[in-house]
Amino acid sequence: MEPNRAFHEAPLPLFAPAPGSAGDEAPLAGAASVACGTRPPSYIADHRARLRERFMQGGAAAMPDYELLELVLFRAIPRQDVKPLARRLLDRFGDFNRVLSAPPARLAEVSGLGPAVLQELKIVEAAAQRLARSRVMHRPVLTSWDALLDYCHTAMAHGEIEQFRVLYLDRKNVLIADEEQARGTVDHVPVYPREIMRRALELSASALILVHNHPSGDPTPSQADIGMTNRIVAAAEVMGIAVHDHLIIGRSRELSFRSEGLL
C-alpha cells in the first residue's frame, strides 16, 4: 500500500470478532501487516492486554493521551498495531479531547483513518457529551452549576468553529431544554433573538442561559458578543423572560457575563 493512502476499515460488529475470524482491515501505513483471518502477533496482543489491564486498575488518569487513544482504536482496528495512527492523530490535533471533537472531514485527512475509526471516535465523543448532559438536564441549574460548566466544556471547549447554545429554564430554574441555536465560522456565529424568543415561548421557558465558545481558546468577549447579548436581553425583557447569564467557553476556562458585570 502506498504510504500516504488511507485505508478504509470494514464496519465493526457490536462484539469483537473471535480470534481467527474474518473481518480484519487492510494494513495501516506504518503498522505491522497481519494476514486476514489470523491472530494478531503476540507482541500486539500482549501490548493490548497490558494497556487494558492498566486502564482497569488505574483508570484513565494513569494513562497518557496516546495510550487512551490506542484503547479507543483497538475496537476499530482489531488486528494491527494502532500506535502509529494514535501518534498521527495527536500530532495533527494536539490532545485526546481535540481528536474526539475534530470535524469528520479533518479526521478523514489523516493517513490510515477510515470509516470504522471515524465512527468509533464519534461514538466516544457522543457518549462523553451524553453523560455530562445527563448531570444537568431536568435539574436546578443553581445547585448543579459546576456540572453545567463541565457539560459546556465537554460539548464546546474544543470545537473548531463557533457554536451558540441556549439553555431554557422553567420557573424553578430547572433546565428543560438545551438547544444549539447556530453554528458559524472560526470567529463568528449568527444569532437571531427573535428565534430564541419564539422557542422560549414554545417551551414556556421563564429564563435563559446563553452559551457560546471561542475556538481561539480565549473567552474574552468581543464587542460583537456584548452587543448581541444586549439585543437578546432586550428582546427577553419584552417577553418577561430573564437572561441569567451568558457564558463564553474557552479552551481551559470560561467567562461569565454576570460575574464580569456585563449583564
Swiss-Prot record:
Binding site for Zn(2+): 212, 214, 225
Motif segment (JAMM motif): 212-225
InterPro entries: MPN (IPR037518), RadC_JAB (IPR025657), RuvA_2-like (IPR010994), UPF0758 (IPR001405), UPF0758_CS (IPR020891), UPF0758_N (IPR046778)
Domain annotation MPN: ranges: 141-263
Gene Ontology molecular-function annotations: metal ion binding; metallopeptidase activity
Gene3D superfamilies: 5' to 3' exonuclease, C-terminal subdomain, Cytidine Deaminase, domain 2
GO biological process, one term: proteolysis
Keywords attached to this entry: Hydrolase, Metal-binding, Metalloprotease, Protease, Zinc
Membership in a protein family: Belongs to the UPF0758 family.
Name assigned to this protein: UPF0758 protein Pden_2304
Highest classification ranks of the organism: Bacteria, Pseudomonadati, Pseudomonadota, Alphaproteobacteria, Rhodobacterales
